[in-house]
Amino acid sequence: MTEADIDVLRDALGLLKDREQIAERLLASSAKHSFDPDSELDWDAPFEEGKWFWPPELVSLYDTPMWRRMSEEQRILLSQHEAAALASLGIWFEIILMQLLVRHIYDKPATSAHVRYALTEIEDECRHSKMFARLISRGDTPWYPVARVHQNLGRLFKTISTTPGSFTATLLGEEVLDWMQRLTFPDERVQPLVRGVTRIHVVEEARHVRYAREELRRQMVTAPKWSQEFTRVTSGEFARVFAIAFINPEVYTNVGLDKRAALAQVKASPHRREVMQNGAKRLTDFLDDIRVLRGVGRRLWRSSGLLA
């Protein structure tokens, strides 16, 4: 590679790292730090009375007038249903992600470390999806599918997305939930099973985030200009979908609350706005650095409520 080539493979964060070296390190980490949730977690242990299923500060209605009128029992029940809804959302995201990864490696050498790591990540995501499904079933809560319009938008996105668009969406689906889960697994107020699920997910998702970030940096340097611009717009629209889908309104109905009133209070809540923006900040700072948050795309991100 000439000096001119090296200069091309730079962005605002510096020189891009070698794709194969990154994948080899991630493969080594996967070999040492991967988990089988079926054997790692105690699925038969009863839930502990009085413990939350999600930290109360992360429950959507926290610190709203409706929250202050709710009993502690109803608040905990809402945390259980919101945890189930987020697990359902996580399964939806991971099924999309697995298809995007398969598309990404379709034309690449199967013997490369980059492809082998993508296949390893798909293995991880299969386990995570099964783990989330088992958590939902264990709690006797319903599965909370996304709205049909979002289901269809996801189907369209995973079909037409550019490679940089795919990795931007991957990071959006992973990093906000990851931020919340990092607050959840050490929290002793939370049910041990939920803490165990989030611990496994955080450890394994850290590798997925590294892989996606490094590949997105490369793509935003090497992709055609039209692809970069298309990525900016589609990522902004996906952020809008994500922000809406993050709350499934049926959780309120299922715990005896007025759905419309609850959604209105969540939308007006400064605390909830701060939680979502804090959860997305590490990602939005990164996307800003690599020139994803530009033009129309940036305005869409801001309208999603994830960008201050």
Task: Give the residues covered by each predicted segment.
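Residues at alpha-helix boundaries and short interhelical turns
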Residues: K108-S112, C126, D140, E188-P192, ...
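Active-site-proximal, substrate-binding regions of enzyme catalytic domains
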Residues: A118
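Soluble, non-transmembrane catalytic domains of enzymes that act on hydrophobic metabolites at membranes
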Residues: R189-R199, R207-Q228, S269-R272, A308
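Active-site-proximal alpha-helical scaffolds that flank and shape metal-associated catalytic sites
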Residues: R134-V203, F230-R240
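Alpha-helical transition-metal enzyme core signature, strongest for iron centers
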Residues: G90-E94, M98, E121-I136, F167-D178, ...
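Terminal targeting/low-complexity segments that flank the catalytic cores of oxidoreductases
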Residues: M1-V102, Y106-V115, S137-P145, V149, ...
